[in-house]
Amino acid sequence: MSAENASTPNESVEILASVPGTTIPAGAEVKTVLITLPGGNPGTPPHRHPGPAFGYVIKGEVIFELEGEPQRVIKAGETFWEPGGDVIHYQGGNNLPDSESQYIATLLAPPGQPVLTFVSEEELEARKDRRAPRP
């Protein structure tokens, strides 16, 4: 039985995101984290993940920006996906100045590797042509 057909009279199953052809590192470790951002918090500095990351905003609004893509706002009830690897994640901060935002992220990484590494100022400068124009 597929997830699309798994609903019963007492429950409902709704697929929130589907990413075909996702590359998952061999023997991947999977971590699910809850991120809570106070109002106006800019989030984690530019970084990357060694494997894909799937996320769901459960409260508030998150500013989201990946290398090569324009920044966008993801609201409560919406999802995001990152391919991981060499792609820089520039922003994941709270879009609301006075209210808390929260999201859940599931991160995949090869065994023994951190799920997040920061990007140096030198690398950001060298790759600035890959960043989408900002509003």
Question: What do the predicted segments below correspond to?
Answer:
Residues 44-48, 66, 73, 92-95:
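Short histidine-centered beta-strand/loop micro-motifs
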